[in-house]
Amino acid sequence: MGVIVNAKQFTEQFWNLTCDRLGAPYTIQYYDFTSSMMHNSGLFIMKIFAVITKDAAVAMNLTYLSIFFIAGIISYFVMRNIKINCWVASLSSAVFALSPYMLFRNIGHIVLTECYFVPLSILLCIWIYERDDVLTLDKDFFKRKINYVALFFTFLIANNGIAYYPFFTCFILMVTAVSKLAKTGKIKQGLRGVVAVIMVCFFVVLSILPGKIYNIMNGSNAAAVDRSGFEQTELYGLKIAQLFMPLNGHGWYDKYIDIYNENAFLVTENSSAYLGILGMIGFIVLMFCLFTKRDSLLKKRLACLSELNISMVLLGTIGGLGSMFAFFVSPMLRAYNRISIFIEYVSILAVALLVNELIRVIKDNKKVVSAWAKRISLVLTGCIFGLMCLFSIWEGYPQLATPAYDTNKMNYISDKNFVENIENSVEAGSMIYHEYPEYGPVNDMWDYHLYIGYLHSKTLKWSYGSIKGRDEDKWNKNVGSMPIDKMVSYLKEQGFAGIYIDRRAYEEEELTTLEGSLKQILNEEPMISDNENLSFFKF
């Protein structure tokens, strides 16, 4: 629901950090939520779709669907940059773009589904590992075009993934810097990774600067974002077993998946860490590459990926480096299992490199006299790899519950008609009070259900949406605690036009009492939606 709210805001205003139609009688300021300022790339894409379509629902859906295309295209660019065959790059990028991680996160966690810049993070590491001209601090720094490209990458990375992806990128850049320093013994070489980290951090600070200024002017608000402590990093840490465990077994091994999920400890969102068939093969290959000679470009490149891979496992795993960081430094990042998408990409990239090398060997093999034999070998290689990729996509596809499309459509139309009727019955720009201001699901009312009024209206202002810990939240709690007769009198004095009730939030007896009291006080029957989920009492 929060995604479509952003889309709605983009159809009515420039950006999404304020909203004068929520939190009435106040204006909502979202500057307390740092995460709202740390996925600007996805919001920018949504803004484009919102401006073009003028429809929040369409803009939201197009934004979601575009993720898979953008992820595939960027991955293809990265693989072609390191000279991987075009069709190998295409197939491998398709596997990444349709990864179990992204499909599982879905639109509900779209800020994490938008992991299309992960390949750029890996490419930065490869450039620093292999090239001596990238981000080298010397007099020719601004003469090399590659540095501008690298800096642009850091800008994109910093504005994606609500702190997680920038943090993971900084980690692997530091791993690359240490590796480069250890291999060359030159501080200058290690500093190139540090420069990249500094630039990512610079752009992150730049993106959250409006929030920091707001906090300085209005005071900090610890209540807005709850982080209980370092122990949550254990709850949401990475489990190596789940890198190899699908979300579903397509009827083949569901029994074993269920046994693990029902009996193992700490099975949470980390179940989305599954690498897929191609990713698992690459992961195992990279583990072996830790111990191989590095006497060719391919082996050196695989060595780079293997170092990144094992380092990311150590960071993400339960009780690993991430837990130590949360305990000793900051617990604000808690779900280190989310590094699994980085692990998946380096694993897929490893397989792509090996297949690419196989193609090169076949083409350069002078022992094969017949050109037809080479062609047949290349065709067979392509077919086998293509089938592997298709099977990996199919096998990794999570069989999530199918939404009740007909019911959702019926409710959507009912909600839309109901809110339009409210808007037609009161003056433009009127304030509407939500009887139930609390956050979180209550009975059959889901979290964010109270956004329905805002989504389907054009000018009405709604009391829902207040930021915890701020004045509007205190006002809402104060009004919500009043006896119903005093509440009605006070709301009339404040200029509200009526009370909106989501009936799903109440037990039957409680709802009957509430609506009965309002009928008696206002001497008026309520408007009721066609699906009977909502009611409205006009003052």
Which residues are covered by each model-predicted region?
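Hydrophobic alpha-helical transmembrane segments
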Residues: M38-G42, A59-S75, A273-C289, E344-V351
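Membrane-interface junctions at the ends of membrane-embedded or membrane-associated helices
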Residues: R80-I84, W127-V149, V178-L191, L290-L298, ...
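Membrane-helix boundary/interfacial segments in multi-pass membrane proteins
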Residues: M102-T113, V225-S228, I257-Y274, S296-L349, ...
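Membrane-interface helix-loop-helix junctions at transmembrane boundaries of multi-pass membrane enzymes
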Residues: T184-V195, E262-N270, F283-T317, K367-V368, ...
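Periplasmic/ER-lumenal interhelical loops and adjacent helix-loop junctions
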Residues: I208-C289, G465
